[in-house]
């Protein structure tokens, strides 16, 4: 891929991307990091999309990099007081711009805490998903008490929980962005949301 900064555009999911998103959701490397590892059928996927369209507390964006769909970023209302959004994401394509995961982190913080005015951005990560835990640490999320325990493949794991308060992001943003590779900081200027 080209080394110049990509345009990272986040567009609400439409029926046009449904088949592609189902392919992504069913990829083993994506399913293994979800609460449920079950393969999703087309009927289940359509029912999920119908429910999503009628639920104002959730939004689901397709992540376009230079007009090519490569992943998703989603939000749901975690609680109303204080207004807290929970987020999740994944990249479904292999050949993406280096640092795309970092751009998802930045986009999530910008959308929730700047565009939507949430007081808190909340995240849950399965304890074996070390790369995402590392990203949240790099971005200075506040770790919370661990969530529920669960077993997968005979091993015990926990749900790691994190939050980021709006005032914390306002204070930390310049420092966090300055610690990232220069090409990532530059690419952060090209994050767009189709609202």
Give the predicted meaning of each segment.
Residues 2-20, 24-27, 67-195:
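Acyl-donor (CoA/ACP) binding surface of acyl/acetyltransferases
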Residues 15-22, 42, 46, 50:
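An amphipathic alpha-helix signature
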Residues 24, 33, 48-52, 179:
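Residues that form generic nucleotide/phosphate-binding pockets
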Residues 27-30, 39, 54, 141:
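Residue-level marker of structural boundaries
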Residues 29-47:
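Conserved GNAT-fold acetyl-CoA-binding loop/helix
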Residues 40-43, 52-54, 91-92:
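Juxtamembrane/interface motifs at transmembrane-helix termini
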Residues 50-62, 71:
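A short helix-loop-beta-strand connector motif used in the catalytic cores of GNAT acetyltransferases and
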